[in-house]
Amino acid sequence: MAATASAIRYAPEDPNLPKPWKGLVDSRTGYLYFWNPETNVTQYERPASSAPPKLAAIPVSSSVQTNQQSSSGFNSGKEDDKYGRGSDGPKSDSGSRFNEAGRTGPISSNDAASGLGNASSGGSSARGPPSSAAGNELSPEAYCRKHEITVSGGQVPPPLMSFEATGLPNELLREVYSAGFSAPSPIQAQSWPIAMQNRDIVAIAKTGSGKTLGYLIPGFMHLQRIHNDSRMGPTILVLSPTRELATQIQVEALKFGKSSKISCACLYGGAPKGPQLKEIERGVDIVVATPGRLNDILEMKRISLHQVSYLVLDEADRMLDMGFEPQIRKIVNEVPTKRQTLMYTATWPKEVRKIAADLLVNPAQVNIGNVDELVANKSITQTIEVLAPMEKHSRLEQILRSQEPGSKIIIFCSTKRMCDQLARNLTRTFGAAAIHGDKSQAERDDVLNQFRSGRTPVLVATDVAARGLDVKDIRVVVNYDFPNGVEDYVHRIGRTGRAGATGLAYTFFGDQDAKHASDLIKILEGANQKVPPQVREMATRGGGGMNKFRRWGTPSSGGGGGRGGYGDSGYGGRGESGYGSRGDSGYGGRGDSGGRGSWAPSRDSSGSSGWGRERSRSPERFRGGPPSTSSPPRSFHEAMMMKNR
């Protein structure tokens, strides 16, 4: 009794809680529940509803066992449900007293008082910044309005506006505070209390919102309650669209789970299976994987998912965009139906709604911001510059020179070849490196490590790095080429302005991009950004406008571009020949052969066939061209421009 009571403490005072109710926290499980000292009743449900405004709920799955109570996610108790999926929550190690909502007399007032008193007298308590930094002077309703949080799905607990209110173990709080966090992000504040009730969640939030810790922290608490033998298989499974994101999730899991001795393996394509299989055989608590590689290992029968009771689908929308839905469904079929499932996505199209309805049971839906419209982070200053292709390189150098020395900058290109060329041109003056789908995993890891450390402050990338790349303090994003659509545009610029910081995004826009003008204007206006008159003119003309640039190629001047195969790395960008191949490079996309109105030189029959790369990328190949009447080129990029005149 004493050991159990010592794990209980009072939650921070809540002025909106009706008297005489008290908030209590079980420090071992992290559960927040409520106690009435007059009637000696304890319950998980908040006595007075303070849930934020509700949206339409997700349709209930018919293919998964639906045994959750829609009002709160708890039933009166199914003793045969080990994980508490759809019942009263997981069985706590501290005893059955915390298992049932509304059960009378689970603790006495004396037990509660004595146990809670010990929480404040211990010398190892992790103290963080003052709670006022977390904004807990706001009511839950005001907090939700301020951060544009809306929820749906039955009775949903209010957000936890400070780390002190979460009831996290001291060792975990120390890890969080040492990382420099002063308060939970909005997605964390609202999703943590729901996840700790063992409920399924759909969380819709923009990139850089802190979603990784949004599911990792409740996952750590889940591991403390479920004592599985890790050698028999993982307890937590996280699916990720790209290997970059997968490795970053692993880094975060090991960083914040270090004090709790949590083990994590990462499975992704483009790397040998041997070391990954050895990690699994040693036993791990968490597996982070791309769907393709995990399916390969499942087919080899080298991993078992029968112990997985906490499943996360991170960036679910991008996994579906990449064609991973069959692999996801195959993996989920190997996971027990008695599980907790959390889905995180930046967008909410019908394809994501469908798979959410199939895989989740009576989920709570958490929305940060506007779900129905694609919106950009308002903390990012967006500058659109209408340029001819020959003007882009010199303008890029001006932007780079205008930044403070050592500022981290990402430049996005449409093709892998342009990515390499720009990196070569910029590396001597600015320190640049390229990353794209043709790089080996070792090369990519090395480039990312140099970029993170600041040794190489400029990263030139295709869209393979647009999703999931989580590097702190990125100051500037430059869209050297406009992407395939505004969705990728929003994801690209989302690399900066993360975790409450501000950022800059420069985008070079040309006549070949005019078809995106109307959508781009909506994004800019939605974020209160300036719209250049030339872009408005393009939108009015429906794609015309910059006739003087048409000699460099138009959207109708060439074809050749097609989708490439699917791969663990995500979008590989547009391929050189426009014909992607199956592998880790992802979507091949449109090519340099003119499918995008590129400035790339046309390939005649006397040279290359136009179906693959040229053998040489050096400037020598351009010396045989017609003499130029202008001044000598200052860069390889300008040499290519002059060759095409």
Curated annotation (Swiss-Prot):
For this chain, the family text in UniProt reads:
Belongs to the DEAD box helicase family. DDX5/DBP2 subfamily.
The record's note on its domains = The Q motif is unique to and characteristic of the DEAD box family of RNA helicases and controls ATP binding and hydrolysis.
Biased composition annotated in UniProt, kind: Basic and acidic residues = 77-91, 612-623
The source's domain of life comes to: Eukaryota
Statement: the UniProt record of this protein carries the keyword Iron: no
What is the main EC category here?
A: hydrolase
Q: List compositional bias (Gly residues) regions by residue number.
A: 556-597
The record's region (Disordered) falls at 1-22, 44-137, 532-645
Locate the motif DEAD box: 314-317
What organism is the protein native to?
A: Arabidopsis thaliana
Q: What Pfam families does the record tag this protein with?
A: DEAD (PF00270), Helicase_C (PF00271), WW (PF00397)
Q: Which SUPFAM superfamilies match?
A: P-loop containing nucleoside triphosphate hydrolases, WW domain
Name of this protein:
DEAD-box ATP-dependent RNA helicase 46
Which pairs are disulfide-linked?
none
Write down the chemical reaction(s) this protein catalyses: ATP + H2O = ADP + phosphate + H(+)
Query: Annotated Gene Ontology MF terms?
Result: ATP binding; ATP hydrolysis activity; RNA binding; RNA helicase activity
